[in-house]
Amino acid sequence: IKDPLGMVGSRLEVNSLIIDAFEPAVKSLVKVVETAGGEISGLIFGPLASSQSVLSKNQKDLGVALVDIGFGTIGLSVYEEGKLVHLAVFPVGASNVTNDLAIGLKISIEAAEAIKCSFGAALAKEVGSRELVDLQKIDPRAKGTASRRFIAEIMEMRLAEIFEFVNNELKRIGKAGRLPAGVVLVGGGAKLAGLIDLARQELRLPSQVGEPEFSNIVLPNGELAIKLE
């Protein structure tokens, strides 16, 4: 029952989803903001804040999963019948893609991040094998060139693994392939070329990039600064 107000009954029960956090980490975050002269009116779980910004009421009613691709973690929020029914966080994120590129191309982390942002793609088959990247122009200590397809192959392996985490979690709660409104991607890596197609392929669900409301601010790294009422 969505709204029991005014109804007659003999017993009222509720299923609640409780979000907790590591207290020292929360206190440290608050202290940093206050030390910088900022004021905190409240705290909210990141993926939950993102879902309030980019998901429509219709999507939440139909059934939708929001995948928040962060630097070090991936957040998953699942909605059905207008309610948040599941949350999960996975200890893998965009930084893992960068690390894989650094190892695979034998370049610095900084150069790997630059290559990911400038030449990266999520689906290797969509990238030409003859397109070459001069590694030394990005990292003076590097040698030779790398094809964009090879770069995409490295990235695709890690991104497919990330979607496997998400799909396994959806299977665990019985929602894999069963969310009519599909998957909405947000976060710094959400607009990577080919990522939507890879998400559709791995999750077997309609997929799209979440677009925030105008009152929110999209930061340079693709994260959201969200104004919540």
Locations of the language-model features?
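Nucleotide/phosphate-binding catalytic cleft detector across ATP-hydrolyzing
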Residues: 1-65, 84, 108-110, 114-152, ...
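Glycine-rich phosphate-binding loops at beta-strand->alpha-helix junctions
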Residues: 21, 121-123, 178-202
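Residue-level signature of catalytic and energy-coupling elements of molecular machines
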Residues: 33, 68, 101, 166, ...
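Short, ordered loop/turn segments at secondary-structure junctions
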Residues: 45-49, 81, 90-92, 117, ...
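Gly/Thr-rich phosphate-binding beta-strand-loop-beta motif of the actin/hexokinase/Hsp70
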Residues: 55-86, 101
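A conserved active-site cap/scaffold subdomain adjacent to cofactor or substrate pockets
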Residues: 91-115
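Phosphate/pyrophosphate-binding loops at sites that engage ATP/ADP/AMP, CoA/4′-phosphopantetheine
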Residues: 163, 167-182
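Glycine-rich phosphate-binding/hydrolytic loop that grips phosphoryl groups
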Residues: 211-229
